[in-house]
Amino acid sequence: MKFFNREKEINKILSIIEGEPNNIYFIYGSLNSGKSTLMREIVVNRLDISKYIPFFIDFRTRNILNVDNFIECLFEVDEKSEIDDFREYAKSLADLLVKGSEEISKYYLGMPIKIPKPFFDKIFNKKDKSADVYQYIEYLFAKLNEKGKKPILIFDELQMIKEITLNGNRKLLWSLFQFLVALTKVQHLCHVFCLSSDSLFIEYVYKTGELEGRADYILVDDFDKQTALKFIDFLAKEILNKKLPKDEKELIYSYVGGKPVLIIKVIDKLRYENLNDILDFMLKDATQKLKYFLNDLDYIKPKVEVGDEVIELKKEDIVKALKLFKDSYEISDSEVAKPIYVYLVKKNILFLNPIEGILKPQSFLIWNAIKRLL
């Protein structure tokens, strides 16, 4: 399927890439709003590959339990290489990426970072692995810069390493951030983009002073109504080879809003189902899930951590918070006690935009379920 829209976000990110690296950029938004799709579109179709070489690290591909898993995600091991001197290998890899054919350049687009097996094995035999990892990446990126190519480092779902610790209980995440600050603001060696659907993680990063003045944030949200209706037109032509009437498009939007993945689901099902049946089932499904979630609160006492405190929640307070959305899709985060919204965000019922201080349901579908049930 052809890529649709997002020109505003694409132009912003391309403008950032054209400048000197100075910040770590966090790309955030609600679940399935299209963050990864956007970055892959930029990497594959919008970059000038004569100037840039992107490395795409997807933490969803592995179960990240420790530093070893983190390192395995960062690199693609060159099993054929017998080079154990990382400097020698980095020079040859930089030459390949800069002087190689267009086919080679396209092959490496958006892959993890290549590393020789002997050096990779050597890293795993050390107690402090992160130092060698960072040293290799820094050296490779410096060589690419010398040869006129700017690396772009992309981390997808970075929050998955949040709880991993290094030796001495130091957080891997903050060790990585220090390294990324060195690569961007200090040495200007590469651009860094961190993608996350976990809005509590974005809040955690945003309010922590260690990245003050070193990070910026880009929201990739669900489509607004006008764009959503155009997306419906686009999909109807691509999938159904026809145009939907205005009332049907309005009906689709009223149920699922501008969530791209849900709009795609509706249009695809229209190949073999009636529109009203599709939408009624989707809303019934979302309502049932919300009902079961609330019913469980009659038997459990959920607890959340806020700072060093563990706070027990009451069902009536959770229901009261959800009822605030009966008349508004968005509310200020100050209207809901933090322990309550933390719990509802963790359960993927609400989305928090910490930069704007806004809470809203993860989707129109959940919003409609709230209004129907409460």
From Swiss-Prot:
Database matches in Pfam families: ATPase_2 (PF01637), MJ1010-like_2nd (PF21690)
GO MF annotation terms: ATP binding
This protein's record includes keyword Nucleotide-binding: yes
Record: residues binding ATP: G29, S30, L31, N32, S33, G34, K35, S36
Entry annotated with the keyword ATP-binding: yes
InterPro entries: Archaeal_ATPase_domain, ATPase_dom, MJ1010-like_2nd, P-loop_NTPase, WH-like_DNA-bd_sf
SUPFAM superfamilies attached to this UniProt entry: P-loop containing nucleoside triphosphate hydrolases
Keywords: ATP-binding, Nucleotide-binding
Signal peptide start and end residues: none
Domain of life: Archaea
Assigned protein family: Belongs to the archaeal ATPase family.
PANTHER family: AAA+ ATPASE DOMAIN-CONTAINING PROTEIN, YALI0E33429P
Protein name: Uncharacterized ATP-binding protein MJ1609
